Amino acid sequence: MGQKIQPHGLRLGITSDWRSRWYADKQYADYLAEDIKIREFLSEGLERAGIANVVIERTHDRVRVDIHTARPGIVIGRRGSEADRIRGKLEKLTGKQVQLNILEVKNVDANAQLVAQSIAEQLVNRVAFRRAMRKAIQGAMRQPQVKGIKVVCSGRLGGAEMGRTERYHEGRVPLHTLRAEIDYGTHEAHTTFGRIGVKVWIYKGDVVGGRRESLMNARDERPSRGGRRERPRRGGARRQRAEKKQEG
């Protein structure tokens, strides 16, 4: 199960948070399609900016878009011209006032999405896929918070006639452990031989404290189904009389 499912979706509410934060009843499908268009517009228009994540929050008359990027200067532009252009496009797309927040990703080598984008860019530039994968693994493992990394590339690797899948990993990546903080990212490299898919999993240790700790404490307080409960001892009155005689 943990090997197949998307790691963020499996751990929602445990170690990861929602990337679309709003509630809707009848307009749910419209808002969802709108979020997809917003993310597609940002990923296609700001491909060189290294966008790691896009978080969207909605109120009744405003849309807040948080862009986590490795190169905030490209998103902002000269004197904020690029940010104003993006805000105008998003307001035209949503029909509401847009609050645009640009946040810098400090540690690029520990972000799975940025690592996947870096590998894909190297594949487009005709770098050997094994060299690109090993370089990404070495850069990630040098970070103190990274406990393990797994990289998968699929497609016509090296221009081969038949597509195949290559996997490299180092350290631990426990995909079945729900308390494990797993960062996941994907990207596609459009080469002259066709598309090559890149997937990256980065393990940053177990989450201790917060909501997860409270859930564990609540579970420990409940009696287990198969556990034996302590039963009251029989013959209590007779035993008490015998104990009183011994004391007397």
From Swiss-Prot:
It holds the Pfam family Ribosomal_S3_C. CDD domains: KH-II_30S_S3. Residues 38-106 form the KH type-2 domain. It comes from the Bacteria. One of its GO terms (cellular component) is cytosolic small ribosomal subunit. Residues 230-242 have a biased composition (Basic residues). InterPro entries: KH_dom, KH_dom-like_a/b, KH_dom_type_2, KH_sf_prok-type, Ribosomal_S3_C_sf, Ribosomal_uS3_bac-typ, Ribosomal_uS3_C, Ribosomal_uS3_CS. One of its GO terms (biological process) is translation. Keywords: Ribonucleoprotein, Ribosomal protein, RNA-binding, rRNA-binding. GO terms for molecular function: mRNA binding; rRNA binding; structural constituent of ribosome. Residues 214-229 have a biased composition (Basic and acidic residues). Residues 214-248 are annotated as: Disordered. NCBIfam families: rpsC_bact. Part of the 30S ribosomal subunit. Forms a tight complex with proteins S10 and S14. Belongs to the universal ribosomal protein uS3 family. Binds the lower part of the 30S subunit head. Binds mRNA in the 70S ribosome, positioning it for translation. This is Small ribosomal subunit protein uS3. The lineage of its organism: Bacteria, Bacillati, Actinomycetota, Actinomycetes, Mycobacteriales.
